[in-house]
Each structure stands twice: as C-alpha cells, then as structure tokens.
C-alpha cells in the first residue's frame, strides 16, 4: 500500500484539530491556521511525517520486531483492534493497565491464568468444579480477555508502539519512554509532540481519520513482514476502499470529542 495521500487526509478530516482554546503551544509548528475556532493542521507536514513513521514501522517488522497498537478511546477501539489482528500484531483497546510493559512479568502471569482458564473451558475440564465456581471463572476469563486479549501471545516486549491520542494514553507513553520503546503516534493539536519519536500530526478523534491511520500502519507492518523471511505475512482479507468524501462540518464536530 502506498503512503497516505493528501486527498485521503482531506476526505477523512485529518486536518481538523481541537478548539483553539484547548491547544498545546508545542504543536504550533504543525498548525496551518484556524477556522471557526478550530485549529487546522498542516497536512503537508502530515504527509511528510507519516512517510517517516510508515518506513520506521516497516523496518521494525522487517527486522523481526513486533508492534503494539494502542487506542482505548471509543472511536479507536474497533479499527485499532481489527487492524492489529489483521497483521498479527499486538493491541490494547479496552484500557491500559499500569505496568503492562514496565511490569510485564507480572502481567504475563495474568495472561497465563487466562490461557489456562480458556483451555479448561475448551477441553471440558472446567466441569469438575462446582457450577458457582464455573460461573465465577467464566467472568474472570471474560474480564482478562477484555484487558489482555490483544497481548495474549506477547512473550516479550514490543519493539515499537503505535498510539492513537498520546494525551489520553499518557501511561502507555510513559512506559514506552522508560523502556526505550520508540513511539509512533497520531498527535492532535492538544497533545505534546516532544514525548513522541515519530509524530503524525492529525485528527485523533474522527473515526474515519483513525481508520485511515490504523489501516495504513497495519499495511506498513505487512510490508515489513514480506521483507523478512522469518515473519509470515498475513493475507489482506479486506482491501481497504478509498475514503468517501466527508462533510467538513460533520468531521469538525467529531474533533470535539474525547
């Protein structure tokens, strides 16, 4: 898949930032101007910076590395999970549990517990427990899956993180920085770009914008996997359709969300 185009960015409303009163002054270099109290992001920079982020992710996977996709806000959950799964990468879409990376050995114990319970339900060995306990264990495995299902096959730390809305995912950003894990992030006008290694200036609230970036970064993973004979590429089951034209007023409204 080629890099994202200016046409795609415009059609999905990537240029709409947050209300001017909610901005982070550090984002000034990435802002084109303002319209009706909304900051407008400089998409020429978005195109250029996305290319760098895309190439970085592709190179990480080509080198045998793994990527964790992070997007816990409502607008991001579905597309982030779907695209990460499509290309065999990790994801966190429900909530970021403190220590998910910095205390991974403890988190891994919870993952092992989840896998054990799942096996017991699958092979029927769970039936040896009283019905009340079976119900409780069913709830436990469901909760564990909600929080950890996207990293259940993660046996070591990822080599890169792709984050939607680093302001919301502050703990994830802190953990990645502490561990030296490079961060690629869609950074809106209310975010701090200084804590991100590969900044992609753009709307992190509009569903269509999030879908575009999640799918494009997933394609970068596939490109990298195709270059690495030790990484089995995942087939692209659903060809991504070209983005449909977007009404500016409608997309601008989406930017005032979380």
Swiss-Prot record:
Ranges for region Disordered: 226-258
Gene3D superfamilies cross-referenced by the UniProt entry: Glucose-6-phosphate isomerase like protein, domain 1 (3.40.50.10490), Helix hairpin bin (1.10.287.610)
Q: A single GO CC term, please?
A: cytosolic small ribosomal subunit
Write out the biased-composition intervals (Acidic residues). 245-258
Give me the segments passing through the membrane: none
Work out whether the entry's keyword set contains DNA damage. no
Sequence ranges of Basic and acidic residues compositional bias: 229-242
Q: Which UniProt keywords apply?
A: Ribonucleoprotein, Ribosomal protein
* Cited InterPro entries: Ribosomal_uS2, Ribosomal_uS2_bac/mit/plastid, Ribosomal_uS2_CS, Ribosomal_uS2_flav_dom_sf
- GO annotation, biological process: translation
**GO MF annotation: an example:** structural constituent of ribosome
NCBIfam families hit by this protein: rpsB_bact
Similarity annotation: Belongs to the universal ribosomal protein uS2 family.
Q: Supply the name of the protein.
A: Small ribosomal subunit protein uS2
């Amino acid at each position: 898949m080629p890099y994202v185009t200016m046409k795609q960015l415009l059609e999905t409303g990537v240029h709409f930032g947050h209300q001017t009163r909610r901005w982070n002054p550090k984002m000034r270099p990435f802002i084109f101007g303002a319209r009706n109290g909304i900051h407008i992001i400089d998409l020429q920079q978005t195109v250029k910076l996305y290319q760098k982020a895309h190439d970085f992710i592709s190179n990480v996977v080509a080198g045998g590395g793994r990527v964790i996709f992070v997007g816990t806000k409502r607008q991001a959950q579905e597309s982030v999970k779907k695209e990460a799964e499509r290309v065999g990468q990790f994801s966190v879409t429900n909530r970021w549990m403190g220590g998910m990376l910095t205390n991974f050995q403890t988190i891994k114990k919870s993952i092992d517990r989840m896998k054990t319970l799942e096996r017991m339900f699958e092979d029927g060995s769970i039936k040896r427990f009283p019905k009340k306990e079976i119900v409780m264990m069913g709830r436990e495995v469901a909760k564990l899956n909600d929080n950890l299902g996207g990293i259940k096959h993660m046996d070591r730390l990822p080599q890169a993180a792709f984050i939607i809305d680093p302001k919301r995912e502050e703990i994830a950003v802190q953990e990645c920085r502490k561990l030296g894990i490079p961060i690629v992030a869609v950074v809106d006008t209310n975010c701090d770009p200084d804590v991100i290694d590969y900044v992609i200036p753009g709307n992190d609230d509009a569903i269509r914008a999030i879908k575009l970036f999640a799918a494009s970064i997933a394609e970068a993973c596939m490109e990298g996997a195709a270059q690495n004979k030790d990484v089995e590429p995942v087939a692209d089951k659903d060809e991504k359709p070209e983005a449909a034209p977007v009404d500016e007023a409608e997309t601008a409204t989406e930017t005032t969300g979380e």
